[in-house]
């Protein structure tokens, strides 16, 4: 009996010692199978904090760092190998062209890395749609790039940031998100970075596209219903690596009793192009038309867009004789997205016909 015990005890100890090794090996195998996703943090409401849980609309944005954001969603480790970088920490209404270029260059560096399968960018919602469209134009990669934010700070009751971030990482790590351009995941929907806009500022269901979402995320799985129709990323003629700076493009708003004061002031301040955010079909007041005609003769590009809330659709030579005036129409791009494309396009050409082609294709 003693002999049997002597044999059993060392054997049992050996098995017990093997259990941690086997568990570690399984953990390593699991991590190897998971996608490698980098989260670039820029600030915004998703990194915001309020004074109490009841503060869903009054809070301070850009307070929480990326490591704290990741730690707040421990389930991320089950769907991807995640690491974070704090690229900047600002409210998105303060993002400028230099910030766009800085972010775009870092995204390109990561996209070139064999160790990165997908990229998530946490962003304030005020200009999220602009950043998403900019990246959609200039990033030469088919790897998933997801821009995500939240409508409520993490300190609020029923905060939406945790699930939005989880969904963003899930989409960024999925192979079926490759080649679909830059995406935005908010409120369980997958939107095209080109199409999506913030439609309301106090609801979690805030981001909508005039042509509908590309898909949905349910319990971390992506379901797709349509593909982007316009050129983007790998098919784009623009490349962040060749863009040194962005020209000044400004927006002038159209409304009843408008004067030409704004457009003249913007041109005098150095605008290379003016997006006219017109009513309806990009309409321009008769008080403003002569000033825009004169500015075009001086070399300023004039681009007609519409500030219709649900999405404008500006037809060329309707409302205004664009061919005669040598103006450009923004197609279905809202004024803020038209500004993004105009800035990027002007790094390639000053020809209005080429600009119009780009507005049709992108």
UniProtKB/Swiss-Prot annotation:
Its EC number is 3.5.1.38. Substrate binds at residues 92, 125-126. Its main location: periplasm. Residues 35-362 form the Asparaginase/glutaminase domain. InterPro entries: AsnASE_II, Asp/glu_Ase-like_sf, Asparaginase/glutaminase-like, Asparaginase/glutaminase_AS1, Asparaginase/glutaminase_AS2, Asparaginase_C, L-asparaginase_C, L-asparaginase_N. It catalyses: L-glutamine + H2O = L-glutamate + NH4(+); L-asparagine + H2O = L-aspartate + NH4(+). It is found in: Periplasm. Gene3D superfamilies: 3.40.50.40, L-asparaginase, N-terminal domain. Induction: Induced by glutamate, via the alternate sigma factor 54. The active site is at residue 45. GO terms for cellular component: periplasmic space. The keyword Signal applies. GO terms for biological process: asparagine metabolic process. Keywords: Hydrolase, Periplasm, Signal. It holds the Pfam family Asparaginase_C. GO terms for molecular function: asparaginase activity; glutamin-(asparagin-)ase activity; glutaminase activity. Residues 1-25 form the signal peptide. It comes from the Bacteria. Homotetramer. Belongs to the asparaginase 1 family. This is Glutaminase-asparaginase. It comes from Pseudomonas fluorescens biotype A. The lineage of its organism: Bacteria, Pseudomonadati, Pseudomonadota, Gammaproteobacteria, Pseudomonadales.
